[in-house]
């Protein structure tokens, strides 16, 4: 809501649902503060629109949060509620890789009995 910029000199972010959970409120506040700091201190912004890919949405948002400076154990509790409802895997861009099947070659093994 940019009307408050002219009346009160503030900006409102009406993105979040109301909650009384202290951890969620803290994570929302930290996210908005980091976003505002990036907007004030950023040197450039990209106007290129990216397409939404559900399989990498959580990973992309996690990387964005890290880019905002929400890095480390002190912001772990801030990242968790923001990423919890997103689809995809936070650790892998193209989904968790499938393990390769292990082949056992027992035909060439000779058993020695002693």
Language model region names:
Residues 1-114:
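C-terminal accessory/tail domains of diverse enzymes
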């Amino acid at each position: 809501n940019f009307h408050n910029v002219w009346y009160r000199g503030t900006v409102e972010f009406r993105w979040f649902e109301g909650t009384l959970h202290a951890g969620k409120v803290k994570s929302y506040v930290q996210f908005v503060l980091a976003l505002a700091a990036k907007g004030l201190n950023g040197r450039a912004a990209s106007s290129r629109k990216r397409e939404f890919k559900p399989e990498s949405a959580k990973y992309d948002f996690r990387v964005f949060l890290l880019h905002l400076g929400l890095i480390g154990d002190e912001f772990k509790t801030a990242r968790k509620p923001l990423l919890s409802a997103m689809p995809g895997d936070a650790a892998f861009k193209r989904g968790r890789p499938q393990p390769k099947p292990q082949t056992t070659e027992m035909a060439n093994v000779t058993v020695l009995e002693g």
